[in-house]
UniProtKB/Swiss-Prot annotation:
EC numbers, comma separated: 1.-.-.-
Cited Pfam families: p450
One CC-aspect GO term: membrane
CDD domains referenced in this protein's UniProt entry, alphabetically: CYP64-like
Signal peptide: none
Entry annotated with the keyword Aminoacyl-tRNA synthetase: no
TM region positions: 7-25
Keyword Ribonucleoprotein: no
Major subcellular location class: membrane
Gene label: COX1
Protein name: Cytochrome P450 monooxygenase COX1
Glycosylation sites: 48, 100, 292, 302, 351, 457
Annotated compartments: Membrane
UniProt keyword terms in alphabetical order: Glycoprotein, Heme, Iron, Membrane, Metal-binding, Monooxygenase, Oxidoreductase, Transmembrane, Transmembrane helix
Length: 518
């Protein structure tokens, strides 16, 4: 027997042993031999790794669903993944079996959270007591019975947004970021100092942007090789460490400085603070001699800081899509303005008390959230243990992706789903409760559903109503005065945003400029 033959036999034995071991391991985990959900066939060892789409994967998964159905199984390097393409499947698993599907993965991206000192953001926390304590604190001050306390802040900042649009209409995308950043910073800490809040918004934006950039596939090698997080920053190729150091400083400042300033203000009265998460949480803390004071203050500090990181990017993206949709559909603007004028008149601007009387504007906000799905694949859920569902086996530790984009663009639920049509939610001039509300999916599922959804919805409504009351929005014009066609195209990130676009804002009447000067 030649040496070459011996090597081939040895290699064959290793391969056979590997497959036997893998098969036995899977059999042990799945003793009843249940089938896995259907999905594209992968390769040995690497599974479906080379098939995973990198650009707008939600579109590919929706297309695969035509072949494999609304529950698909993929595997990459041994990591099982479940793709859900329908609302009913998502509710079955993530709502009805939430105890098993509320965890988050520990992946290299989470290591980046540690490098950036972002491990205080409870959206990334593992499911357990620590996560529950943070969510409880957040929900205590942002539940649907509490958000009315923040309506004055939303109204003040929305009027400032309108004034900025009058002064610098070309910067409308930046104005939307500032609007929602300012609302959330004020609700988080209660400071009315505009310049100070502006600094806080800019720092929080830098932190959110840095994180979003860091998790783009291929952006940093540390995502693929976690051991690189221990490489010193001075080594060639370790530039990510310097970026992480910069973001870590911002994170530490974002977490500590404003919270400590609120504590000092409440203690000494050296500056004015209004109703906010931080004020409420600090005032509810036990005496400093209490055994749990330190741990409770950590939760209060984290909860106050995470408001912006957790919510601003998604709300800004929705707002920018809403403005784009209005610029593309002047007929929608006219109908909304007719409703607004009938409710508000022309002697004041809309406020939150007008919301129940403006179903068409509410429908615009709902449709914007469906038409542009900000989180097309949501945040990853993880199965805490193996499960059987509809005759299929779901392994422990499976990554669960809900294809929210597919749900929101299902033609069986939403006729002509690529069309922006607020009237799909209306019947006899009122919200039609028989039509699926996009909020059933766009804010997440189960115990991981977004706790800031009521605040976000109110902020978007007020922006839409105030914007439509004050301005006509139009597509930009070319040199000949002809309108330049607009369309919705988005980034391919975890949180998608409309690609930059232009539009024009025209005051409906000088009266509105005068109102805003009062």
């Amino acid at each position: 027997m030649t040496s070459t033959t011996q090597v081939l036999i040895a290699l064959s034995s290793i391969v056979v042993a590997y497959f036997v071991k893998t098969a036995l391991a899977k059999r042990k985990l799945n003793p009843r031999g249940l089938p896995y959900p259907p999905g594209p066939k992968g390769l040995p060892v690497i599974g479906n790794l080379t098939q995973l789409p990198q650009h707008k994967p939600w579109l590919v998964y929706k297309e695969w669903g035509r072949t494999y159905g609304d529950l698909m199984y993929l595997e990459a390097m041994g990591q099982p993944m479940i793709i859900i393409n329908s609302l009913s499947r998502a509710l079955d698993l993530l709502d009805k079996r939430a105890v098993n599907y509320s965890d988050r993965p520990h992946v290299p991206t989470m290591d980046l959270c540690v490098l950036m000192k972002l491990d205080w953001v409870f959206a990334f926390m593992q499911y357990g007591a620590d996560w529950r304590n943070h969510r409880r604190a957040f929900h205590q001050y942002l539940n649907h019975n509490m958000v009315h306390n923040y309506h004055p802040i939303q109204e003040q900042e929305t009027q400032e947004f309108l004034r900025a649009l009058i002064a610098r209409p070309k910067d409308f995308l930046a104005h939307t970021r500032h609007l929602f950043g300012s609302i959330i910073i004020r609700i988080s800490y209660g400071f009315e100092d505009e310049e100070y809040n502006k600094v806080l918004v800019e720092e929080a934006e830098a932190l959110a942007s840095g994180f979003s950039e860091s998790i783009i596939p291929g952006r940093y090698l540390v995502n693929a090789f976690p051991f690189l997080r221990h490489v010193p920053s001075w080594l060639p190729g370790a530039g990510f460490q310097r970026t992480m150091q910069y973001l870590r400083k911002i994170s530490e400042k974002t977490l500590s400085e404003p919270f400590d300033n609120v504590k000092e203000a409440l203690k000494t009265g050296n500056r004015q603070v209004g109703p906010s998460l931080a004020v409420g949480l600090i005032e509810s803390l036990p005496d400093e001699t209490h055994a749990n004071r330190t741990s409770l203050e950590v939760v209060a500090r984290n909860t106050s800081a995470l408001s912006y990181i957790a919510g601003a990017d998604t709300t800004v993206s929705s707002a920018q899509a809403l403005i784009l949709a209005l610029a593309m559909h002047p007929e929608v603007q006219r109908k909304a303005q007719k409703e607004i004028d009938s409710v508000v008149g022309t002697d004041r601007l809309p406020n939150m008390s007008d919301k129940p009387n403006m179903p068409y504007v509410q429908a615009i906000v709902k449709e914007a959230g469906r038409w542009h799905t900000v989180l097309p694949l949501g945040f990853i859920h993880v199965s805490a243990k193996e499960d059987e569902y509809d005759g299929y086996f779901i392994p422990k530790g499976s990554f669960i992706f809900v294809n929210t984009w597919a749900i929101m663009h299902d033609p069986d639920v939403f006729k002509n789903p690529l069309q922006f049509n607020p009237e799909r939610y209306l019947k006899n001039g009122q919200i039609d409760t028989s039509v699926l509300d996009p909020e059933a999916a766009t804010f997440g599922f189960g115990r991981r559903i977004c706790p800031g959804r009521w605040l976000s919805n109110d902020s978007l409504f007020l922006m839409a109503a105030s914007l439509l009351a004050t301005f006509n929005i139009a597509a930009p014009k070319d040199r000949t005065g002809k309108p330049i066609p607009l369309s919705l195209d988005t980034s391919s990130h975890l949180i998608t945003a409309p690609l930059p676009y232009d539009c024009e804002f025209q005051l409906r009447s000088p009266k509105y400029a005068a109102l805003l000067q009062k």
